[in-house]
Amino acid sequence: MPGIRTQMTGPARAAARAGVLLMLAAACSNGGHDEDASAPDSVSADTTAAEPVVLEEAFLTERDTLDNVDSPTVWNGPNGEHWILTSAKTTDVVLVNDAATGAEIRRLGGTGSGRGQLDRPNGVRAIDDLLFVVERDNARIQAFSLPSLESMGTFGEEELLRPYGIAAYEDAEGRIEIYVTDNYELVEDEIPPDSALGERVEQFRVWVEDGELRDEHVRSFGDTTGEGVLRKVETIGVDPANDRVVVAEELGPDSHWKIYRLDGTFSGEVFGRGYFPQEAEGLALYTCPDGGGYWIATDQGMGENTFHVFDRRTLEHLGAFAGVTTRNTDGVALTQAGFGPFPAGAFYAIHNDGNVAAFSWAEIAAALGLRTDCTEGAAPADSAQ
């Protein structure tokens, strides 16, 4: 059942959504993309930097391209559980694997629209004792309890049209703030005109009260003019300490990252231009208590598949790495918890639709001169898809 609403009733919100769709459709007649964009604040790119360091994967999970996997997230439980949870778009499940060995533990879901069922799951995010799964073709988000993996309910049905990526953090009151990208189309396989792109991101607030999932829709956002316009979206990340919501603009040939504020306003900042000639995809954040850390962002490709590292605060490009085997990466995830073979944490990346590759953070850090001192006692860092 859907989560308990705290604002409009379902019918009222559905009617409001229908009105928005009419306005979006009307916008199609008002012209195409706005090319008169003002110059944003941008971190300059020296794309002549050295080739990425190539690192051997610690392991790859068992491969099955029929699953068509997309995005991983990591959960470190209170009783020694360390799981990778990965969406499988074709088989409509979430794969649960041991994060230390890659061994499969179970599969969650199955095709359908009922409680506990999934339809083209895409972005996933584990936070505290909840797993959130974005379902593109059910146009909703479903929450599952951890470690039981029982469905807690769904939300977003009145707001979402074609959702993909998810990012989340816990606020000061213990509620979970969730940002979801919505790559809706008004005509199949066509990007709407800029004037119709004002709802590319939906924000929700979620909490559990008396054993029930409760949610409220906070806002829809996305600029419709200028540099902040989001034309093709999937991956999203959030850094509340720096008031940043980071969204990939996947539309080539100028794929890069745009920075919005937590309140949904465009900051004027973009970064990564020149580093993503193929497509900006999976994103993860490594955080340190002193405010330092790194964004790890993927340039997805079959021939060259590169993970770029940017300074968390300045957004300066610090280096890049690639896997010996890993190619065509959609989502990624990072954990700063030390366990098993990964005393400084681990980085996980999708490999060409079929399985998940694991990398030691200690090895990544050694190769690129990065920090490893933000591990002990750290919660899993935000992952985004």
How would you name each of these model-derived features?
Residues 1-4, 42:
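Intrinsically disordered, low-complexity Ser/Thr- and Pro-rich stretches
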Residues 3-18:
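Bacterial N-terminal signal peptides that target proteins for export
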Residues 29-385:
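Sequence/structural signature of beta-propeller domains
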Residues 24-27:
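C-terminal motif of bacterial Sec signal peptides marking the signal peptidase cleavage site
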